[in-house]
Amino acid sequence: ILPMGQVIAIKCNGLAIGKYANMAQLGVPFFNNAKEGLDNAGKKGWEIGRIPLPVFMEHIQLIGTPDISKIDTVPMTIDEFPAIDADFMTIAKWAGRLVRIDNVYFTRQEYDYGKPADLDEADKIFAPSTNGIGYPQSRIFALQSDPKKISAIGTSEYAKFADAPLPASDYVGSITGFISYYWDKGGSS
């Protein structure tokens, strides 16, 4: 939507702030009727929803011109990820931070109830469709020097690259993204 390196200011009037997995989330008020997809009666009520693109564009102001050199990532290793059972302050320190992990590759697996599982051929993309349910898709990556050290990225099916194929496991590179936490009943994070 906007070029990388574009600084923006967001006018929050008319938007709502909530949380997802203890991270602040900016969106629009949305009433979950607990009748669609995998929703359950316990989730019925108001929550934060996605910001439609036209609404997003009305709420931003561009500051200066895009400058990719000003994107500041924190280099990190898999071992440095705070454990999901860490105290709130540790999680709060890292959640939402833009980090880069070098020398990793995709294993072409996902977490299934907290354990690595091979992907079907059709699912070897970043985020297969959830038919509108919208839960993030986990894709496992490993450290080249120690393949037993793994973690995962979560990608929304709404991402521009959602249906792009995962790189072959012999492709080693860097992953840049925001740290977030997700905890399901199966124990994956």
Predicted regions span which residues?
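OB-fold nucleic-acid-binding modules
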Residues: 1-189
